[in-house]
Amino acid sequence: MVFGMNLGNRRKATRVPDLSRYDYHYNGSGGNSVNQGDNYLKSHELSADAAFAASARAGSLVNYPERGYTNISRANSLRMGHPGQQQQQSSYIPRSYSFTARGAYAPRTGNVGNRRSVSAIPRTGTASSRGVGSRTGSMTGSVARVGSRTGSFAGGGNGSIIIKTQEVKDMMGRTQSITTQTIRRINGMEYVETTTQTAGLVEDPQFHFQQFAENDEFPISDELSATPPAAPLSESQPRTNQRLANFNSNAINNSAANNIRSDSEEEGEEHFTDASDVVEESGAFAEDDQDHFLAKVNKVDVDNNSKSYTSRKPLVQKQGVQQQQEVQHQGISQVQNTEAKSVGRKSTMSKRMTLRDTPNAQLEPEKDTTDQATPDNNATKRKSIFKSKKRNEAVAVPTVPTSDQKTLSQEEMYAIALEIAQQKYGHPTKTVSHSTDNGSRNEMTPILEDADVEQPHVLPTTLHLPTREEQIQHEQLQQPTAAIPTNEKSRHPKKKVKSILDRVVQFSQENSGNQPPKQHRGKQYSQQPPDVAPSNGTTDNFDTNASGHNINHNNNNHNNNNNTSSSSSLRHESGANPVVVTEDTTVLAASTAATPVDVNEPGNPDHVIPASSPSIDNTPRINEKTKSKKKNEKGSFFKRLFKSNKTHINTK
């Protein structure tokens, strides 16, 4: 504790400033009060020179005028001055020091000057007793620059007058205020008079922050604060002034901002002169443009949109009506031409099936033997549908006129189906004409060798060997997938070719009667299973097992087993119709040249029918019961066709 107290005492002793070394400037030795006057006389020369140098160094300051200033405030004070209190007495300005001129140097101190130094008022008893006046300049340490000018007038006796002027400037160098302080010493008393003059209006500190917060829209408003007010505004502009009053607290700034805003609004209205006329005609808004400016713009937009809609509406309606008429026309033609479209569907289902290439010259006999009831333009349309070999392109279905639909018979439809299949793949069969027609063939029985349906092709009751052309033709159409010795080599698989021709023959046999409407076919699709083979009391029944060899013929109660490698075999009985037997599977054998199938003459080697040669019924056996059953079985043909194709694909 003692050690700490001793340290504290030592610190206090060192912190006390020792001003004794400055006493020789004022009091000489500074220690003896008796010799104080003599010692002071020894050092007055140095102090006078220092004061003069300080006043001469600040002579470049500009004297500012003192006119035209308002808000003058004065303060008077009376103080007593005692000798020996220079360092202990504090003036009204902190950090003040005094310099006093004495003796012979009194006339020199009468000059007026400015200096930049921290100075105070000289207060010494000796100066007042000797009647010496001093004149110095001062400057206080503040945020802004302060220039001061002090004038002293020496009087007789104990009287002296000291005048000090302070000038405050801002950072831009503009004068903000001028303070004049007059000190009179009369009989040891000091009279202090202070006068302050301001250069202009003092800005509100709150408004200083408003220019950064609310008045960002008009950055030049601060510079326009000293400008005179603008001309009086019109009657419509005071309302805008009220709207902008919340942004500015100064009336001058508000007027300048309103002038800028009004000019921008007038420029904007020039673009909407035509719009304002429209709104005035409607009578929905007042005549004041600035109050309803935004409402006008919105109203004009709505009117323009409505006008554009009304002008474009008739065009849209016309186009819509035309499109609806076209759609309705197409819909009516599609409903009325269901048979023609079904033919098109049949052709698209067999896109993956190809036929062997044959000469294109074989197409020419078809033109001469086409049905006369069907117009030529329809036939050409049907031919042109499938000329393109691009499978990706959509095939347009021709629309048959309503007047020709009544003449389109079932026979024509089958002919079209065969013709489409031939034209699609470019492999038509050669036309073989026969003059023998005893009238025993059914009308609806198709002829595979003849593309013309109207030309009959009938085998005689006495079987004979087919011609070379027929044999070559049918071998081209039905070649097995394996390499079987034949007259001509096959380049395409047999199963796909066989499926087309077999289904056409079966379809012709099943659908010899009238076709039911299309809606009944859909019902029969679900009623008739696809696996059921057509069977009745008077027609042929085909029952093909898994291997495709056992065929049951129920016409005259004959049961025969026919194991061949061909896809079609002919079995003929005396007094009965030859039957075309279709098989879905193929059995490879060493030789398929011919197969004897004559039941009445089993040992006759002359009567041999080629395995690939189809035969057609000679006599019609169709009654009412047969027609009704064949109508029901007609719809399941395509299902069986698709299923048989899948079977071929699975058996590969």
UniProtKB/Swiss-Prot annotation:
Disulfide bonds: none
Chain intervals with Polar residues compositional bias: 125-141, 337-361, 506-517, 524-544, 612-621
Entry annotated with the keyword Cell membrane: yes
GO biological process: DNA recombination; meiotic cell cycle
Function: May be involved in the control of meiotic sister-chromatid recombination.
Primary localisation category: membrane
Composition bias type Low complexity, residue spans: 316-336, 545-569
Membrane topology category: Peripheral membrane protein
Compositionally skewed regions (Basic residues) per UniProt: 380-390, 640-652
Gene for this chain: MSC3
Keywords: Cell membrane, DNA recombination, Meiosis, Membrane
Protein name, per record: Meiotic sister-chromatid recombination protein 3
Subcellular location: Cell membrane
